[in-house]
Curated annotation (Swiss-Prot):
The gene is tsf. The lineage of its organism: Bacteria, Pseudomonadati, Campylobacterota, Epsilonproteobacteria, Campylobacterales. One of its GO terms (cellular component) is cytoplasm. Signal peptide: none annotated. SUPFAM superfamilies: Elongation factor Ts (EF-Ts), dimerisation domain, UBA-like. Residues 82-85 are annotated as: Involved in Mg(2+) ion dislocation from EF-Tu. It is found in: Cytoplasm. One of its GO terms (molecular function) is translation elongation factor activity. Associates with the EF-Tu.GDP complex and induces the exchange of GDP to GTP. It remains bound to the aminoacyl-tRNA.EF-Tu.GTP complex up to the GTP hydrolysis stage on the ribosome. Belongs to the EF-Ts family. Coiled coil: none annotated. This is Elongation factor Ts. InterPro entries: EF-Ts_dimer_sf, Transl_elong_EFTs/EF1B, Transl_elong_EFTs/EF1B_dimer, Transl_elong_Ts_CS, UBA-like_sf.
Length: 357
């Protein structure tokens, strides 16, 4: 049995919002496995999904560079020790120059970057001189570049505070449609920066992930229903528990069965068959929406668009395809947040938490 420390309990509590004893018990039941403890709490309806932001620590900036012809988009992250330096004009210039250098030289790795030449000197030496001038340790943590294929287009967006950057690539069926899609892609990048989808579409979801999230979703809804039954508020009816959580689960057979049920309902209601074709599509869309809640939470195409929350990103793209007269397929997106995935430094809070256990 792994030792369950106060620090572990506090981290789990801050990540999930669950009670302290619930967190301690979850860690005990999962032998100290953080991710399994999160899942256990969620299946019991006691906590929310762990937020990536709860585990961010580093300071620094994310930078984005899009080529003038919209065929190459690069995003990079350079870390500093303090937020003060991250606002330094020289550091800001360093991040922009480095990102442009990466793109202009088609660099593929941090190691390749350090051995490259910039302004006549090795980048490694150039960075050391910047460190000496700025007065803090600086680290090029990561970068990535997306390239447009034939009739493709890329774009990017950097949030005003420089902590979040996004690049995106799309394939189109003509150069004209690709050119018209530039602004759309930038707006979708802004959506990604705000909503942080984890996947492109439901097709990218792992079935085990879907099944685990479905259990957590049902537990959460049942817990809310229990509270609504207790309050007996007529303005807050109970949630309908969905059969499924993602379009990944909606096979052709399941969709066919749902359609047949709708037809039976229409027949029972005495609706004439000649108007069924006008009713069935809307009811099928409602069925899919009710049973794909994970898609709207985790996937870009399934999320409601921040600039028009009555439409999904997928629907917005479909409308633009009609307007532009051609196909637009989002191929890939990359979103960097400063410090994402880095562990926090240990703080002196163990005694405070231990006193409550």
């Amino acid at each position: 049995m792994a030792e369950i420390t106060a620090a572990m309990v506090k981290e789990l509590r801050e990540s999930t919002g669950a009670g302290m004893m619930d967190c301690k018990n979850a860690l005990s039941e999962t032998n100290g496995d953080f991710d399994k403890a999160v899942q256990l709490l969620r299946e019991k309806g006691l906590g929310k999904a762990a937020k990536k932001a709860d585990r961010l620590a580093a300071e620094g900036l994310v930078s984005v560079k899009v080529s003038d012809d919209f065929t190459s988009a690069t995003v990079s992250e350079i870390n500093s020790e303090t937020d003060f330096v991250a606002k330094n004009d020289q550091f800001i210039a360093l991040t922009k120059d480095t990102t442009a250098h990466i793109q202009n030289n088609s660099l593929q790795s941090v190691e390749e970057l350090h051995s490259s030449t910039i302004n006549g000197v090795k980048f490694e030496e150039y960075l050391k001189s910047q460190i000496a001038t700025i007065g803090e340790n600086l680290v090029v943590r990561r970068f990535a570049t997306l390239k447009a294929g034939a009739n493709g287009v890329v774009n990017g967006y950097i949030h005003t505070n420089g902590r979040v950057g996004v690049v995106i690539a799309a394939a189109c069926d003509s150069a004209e449609v690709a050119s018209k899609s530039r602004d759309l892609l930038r707006q979708i990048c802004m959506h990604i920066a705000a909503m942080r989808p984890s996947y492109l579409s439901y097709e990218d979801l792992d079935m085990t992930f879907v099944e685990n999230e479905y259990k957590a979703l049902v537990a959460e809804l049942e817990k809310e229903n229990e509270e609504r039954r207790r309050l007996k508020d007529p303005n807050k009816p109970e949630h309908k528990i969905p059969q499924f959580a993602s379009r990944k689960q909606l096979s052709d057979a399941i969709l066919k069965e749902a359609e047949e049920k709708i037809k039976e309902e229409l027949k029972t209601q005495g609706k004439p068959e000649k108007i069924w074709d006008n009713i069935i599509p809307g009811k099928m869309n409602s069925f899919i929406a009710d049973n794909s809640q994970l898609d709207s939470k985790f996937t870009l195409m399934g999320q409601f668009y921040v600039m028009d929350d009555k439409k999904t990103v997928e629907q917005v793209i479909a409308e633009k395809e009609k307007e532009f007269g051609g196909k637009i397929k989002i191929v890939e997106f990359i979103c960097f947040e400063v410090g994402e995935g880095l562990e926090k430094k240990t703080e002196d809070f163990a005694a405070e938490v231990a006193a409550q256990l």
